[in-house]
C-alpha cells in the first residue's frame, strides 16, 4: 500500500513522521510553510493507495470532496487528530482498506480506531471486505448495499461460486439453490442481477498483425469480452511473443488498461503445457504454432480458460492462475 501523509502543525508533523516510520509513505506539511493542500490532494488521490491527514476531519473532508468517485476506485482516506487520540477511516473502509489502515495506525500511536461502517460495528459479514481479501474486483459496487443491507436486517443471503470456497460460510451466508438465485457470485463470467466479484487471476494472451493499432485491439477486446460474457476486471496482465515487443499499438492498449506485458520467445512458448489451437501459418511466421494461448498459459502459470479467438488480424485467449478462495474475511481470522 502506497501511503501519503500530510500534517499542518509541528506536533502533527511529528506524529505523521512517527506513523510513516511504521507504515511507510511520503510525509508533507501543508499550509503557509508547506505544500498547497489542493495540489497535494489532487496528486495523491491519483497516485497513492492511502491518504492520511493529521489534523481536523473537516480539513480532510473538504480536501477530498472534489475527487471522490466510487468505493471501487477511491483510495483509502484516514484522519488522525494531531494528538494521536483517534484514527478515523473516512473513505474506502473496505475495498480501499481504510478500516484496516486506521487500526494499524492507531496501534502505532495508541489511538482509538473509530470504525463507523455498520457491518464492522455489528460483526456482520462484509462482502466487499471479503472481496478485497480474496483479490477480487467488484463489478457493480452499487449492489454492495443490497447484500450488506440484507445481512444487517437479519436476512440470509445466497452465493454462487465457480470455485470451491474452503471453510465455513459466515453467519447468514448460504449457497444458492441455483446460480440465478444468488445475491452475490464469485465468477469471471457475470450475468444477471447479483453482485459479481471478479477474481483478478486472468492473463490475456495477444497475437496481432504488425502495425495493429490500439484502437483495433480495443475493439477486438470489447467484442471478445461480450461474446464470452467475460469480465475484463479479471485480467491482471497480458502476454505475447517477443516479436511484438516493439508494437506501439499493443503497448498503448496495455497501458490504457494498466497491464504489465510479458513477452516470450518462440522456444519458450513451445514449452507451454496443454492442448492448443495449432496454425501452420502462425508457425511459418513466428516459429511456434500458437501465440495467444501459449503466452497466456505461460504468464498465468495456469490453465487455458478461453481458447483462441480471432477477428480482424487480432487473436486473443485467456488463461487463469491458480485460485483457492476461502471464507476468511477479517485479518484476525486464522
Could you say what each language-model-derived stretch is?
Residues 41:
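Conserved acetyl-CoA-binding loop-helix of GNAT-fold acetyltransferases
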Residues 8, 12-18, 25, 34-36, ...:
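Conserved mixed alpha/beta catalytic, RNA-binding, or beta-rich assembly cores of soluble enzyme
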Residues 148-175, 274-296, 300-310, 319:
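Long, charged alpha-helical interface segments
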Residues 237, 241-294, 300-304, 311-314:
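C-terminal non-catalytic interaction/assembly regions of soluble proteins
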Residues 1-5:
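Extreme N-terminal starter segment of soluble prokaryotic enzymes
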